[in-house]
């Protein structure tokens, strides 16, 4: 029986990156052997065991043979005669198919180290096409390692495009698509994930609402980048900058809202382009459709829909009437969900800066709207009750006093 460290731990170690999870492969053993050594079996689909001391996962070396469509249609063989090389070749990319022996030797039968040095994401064998989930995984790795200079090999991109056209992607469950996508949203360059999926044709299959933005023009005066898909990717990049060092915000929810904020632009009638009157309200339906299909968590969906509907309100914050401001606060339920409103404001800032040449633009609207929010929050509900108001009258009086507080703050707010 031999044990090897495999996959991501070896890859990241060679890249000089911190190793998060360590996976191990056991060659020349069967389940009975590991159980006798005190390992605990946890895998249902294939034998995975927890080390009694470290609690790290140890899997028996295995081979896989495609038996039906999708990413679950495989027949596995876990016999003790399976070699390390046979196990490694079933993996997706060469850089993920290296192993390290217990004495520290790197075993690299498929050129992963060379591809690591050359910054290339390359599939190992034609068997790559047997698992459609790999299209998303490779796009996610491209997003993760883009800042280190990694590119996807042209032949791998071609295989990904073939998979996108084959109909195999339709066999992916909503849960798996969303899991990969949420992971991608938390990478350093999530825009690369979506750009890669667009390049391979997978975006139109899995995220048609986002893909529909491609080629939709905006007025060049406000959007020198013109294209709505390019703008959305620039907004996503800005959202990353604004959230990566902010532990309070829900990073992936903010980034998802950034992607959805302009989905309504894909529905703009041709005869009024490049203007997009009413795109805010129009964006709610495609956002809802996307979220329902992919079973996106409700928090993400709510923030994305509200962002679609109200992002231009913040751009025009200085023009809003006090009544409109309170209606906005009520729609966001800022009284009970203050963080969600702050996350929304970050998307609005990302939207302003996600335009070519506007990357460092000041956005005083956030300070202004937060001052109005502070004033509205200062209104004491207990005082309203103490003043003798009851039931619905409490809510009506509270709204009146909040509107008055906002009006006073607007009047006193410095305009220069």
From Swiss-Prot:
Family matches, as Pfam families: HD (PF01966), PolyA_pol (PF01743), PolyA_pol_RNAbd (PF12627)
GO molecular function: ATP binding; CCA tRNA nucleotidyltransferase activity; CCACCA tRNA nucleotidyltransferase activity; cyclic-nucleotide phosphodiesterase activity; magnesium ion binding; phosphatase activity; tRNA binding
Record key words, sorted: ATP-binding, Hydrolase, Magnesium, Metal-binding, Multifunctional enzyme, Nickel, Nucleotide-binding, Nucleotidyltransferase, RNA repair, RNA-binding, Transferase, tRNA processing
Binding site for ATP: 8, 11, 91, 137, 140
Positions of the HD domain: 228-335
EC id: 2.7.7.72, 3.1.3.-, 3.1.4.-
Catalysed reactions listed for this entry: a tRNA precursor + 2 CTP + ATP = a tRNA with a 3' CCA end + 3 diphosphate; a tRNA with a 3' CCA end + 2 CTP + ATP = a tRNA with a 3' CCACCA end + 3 diphosphate
Entry coiled-coil feature ranges: none
Residues bound to CTP: 8, 11, 91, 137, 140
Cofactor(s), names only, from the UniProt record: Mg(2+); Ni(2+)
CC cofactor note: Magnesium is required for nucleotidyltransferase activity. Nickel for phosphatase activity.
InterPro entries: CCA_bact, HD/PDEase_dom, HD_domain, NT_sf, PolA_pol_head_dom, PolyA_RNA-bd, tRNA_CCA-adding_enzyme
One Gene Ontology biological process: tRNA surveillance
Residues annotated for Mg(2+) binding in this entry: 21, 23
Subunit architecture: Monomer. Can also form homodimers and oligomers.
Other information: A single active site specifically recognizes both ATP and CTP and is responsible for their addition.
Family the UniProt entry places it in: Belongs to the tRNA nucleotidyltransferase/poly(A) polymerase family. Bacterial CCA-adding enzyme type 1 subfamily.
Role, per record: Catalyzes the addition and repair of the essential 3'-terminal CCA sequence in tRNAs without using a nucleic acid template. Adds these three nucleotides in the order of C, C, and A to the tRNA nucleotide-73, using CTP and ATP as substrates and producing inorganic pyrophosphate. tRNA 3'-terminal CCA addition is required both for tRNA processing and repair. Also involved in tRNA surveillance by mediating tandem CCA addition to generate a CCACCA at the 3' terminus of unstable tRNAs. While stable tRNAs receive only 3'-terminal CCA, unstable tRNAs are marked with CCACCA and rapidly degraded.
Free-text comment about domains: Comprises two domains: an N-terminal domain containing the nucleotidyltransferase activity and a C-terminal HD domain associated with both phosphodiesterase and phosphatase activities.
Name of protein: Multifunctional CCA protein
Species, as recorded: Haemophilus influenzae (strain ATCC 51907 / DSM 11121 / KW20 / Rd)
């Amino acid at each position: 029986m031999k044990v090897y460290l495999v996959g991501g731990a070896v890859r990241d170690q060679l890249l000089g990156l911190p190793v998060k999870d360590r996976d191990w492969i056991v060659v020349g053993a069967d389940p009975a052997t590991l159980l006798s050594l005190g390992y605990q079996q946890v895998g249902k689909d294939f034998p995975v065991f927890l080390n009694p001391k470290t609690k790290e996962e140890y899997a028996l070396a295995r081979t896989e043979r495609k038996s039906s469509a999708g990413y679950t249609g495989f027949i596995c063989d876990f016999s003790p005669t399976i070699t390390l090389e046979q196990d490694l070749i079933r993996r997706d990319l060469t850089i993920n198919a290296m192993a390290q022996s217990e004495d520290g030797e790197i075993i690299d039968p498929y050129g992963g180290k060379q591809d690591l040095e050359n910054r290339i994401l390359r599939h190992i064998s034609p068997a790559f096409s047997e698992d459609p989930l790999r299209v998303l995984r490779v796009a996610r790795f491209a997003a993760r390692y883009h800042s280190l200079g990694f590119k996807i090999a042209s032949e791998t991109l071609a295989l990904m495009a073939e998979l996108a056209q084959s109909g195999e992607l339709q066999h992916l469950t909503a849960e798996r698509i969303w899991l990969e996508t949420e992971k991608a949203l938390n990478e350093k360059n999530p825009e690369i994930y979506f750009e890669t999926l667009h390049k391979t044709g997978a975006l139109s299959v899995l995220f048609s609402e986002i893909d529909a933005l491609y080629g939709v023009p905006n007025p060049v005066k406000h959007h020198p980048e013109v294209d709505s898909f390019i703008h959305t990717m620039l907004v996503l990049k800005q959202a990353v900058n604004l959230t990566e060092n902010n532990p309070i915000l829900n990073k992936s929810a903010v980034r998802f809202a950034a992607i959805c904020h302009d989905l309504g632009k894909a529905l703009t009638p041709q005869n009024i382009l490049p203007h997009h009157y009413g795109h805010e309200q129009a964006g709610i339906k495609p956002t809802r459709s996307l979220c329902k299909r992919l079973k996106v968590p409700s928090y993400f969906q709510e923030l994305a829909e509200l962002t679609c509907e109200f992002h231009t309100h913040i751009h025009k914050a200085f023009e809003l009437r006090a009544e409109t401001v309170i209606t906005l606060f009520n729609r966001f339920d800022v009284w009970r969900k203050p963080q969600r409103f702050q996350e929304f404001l970050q998307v609005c800032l990302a939207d302003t800066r996600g335009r070519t040449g506007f990357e460092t633009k000041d956005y005083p609207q956030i300070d202004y709207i937060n001052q109005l929010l502070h004033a509205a929050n200062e209104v004491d509900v207990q005082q309203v009750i103490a003043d003798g108001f009851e039931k619905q009258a409490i809510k009506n009086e509270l709204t009146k006093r909040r509107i008055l507080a906002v009006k006073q703050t607007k009047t006193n707010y410095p305009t220069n």
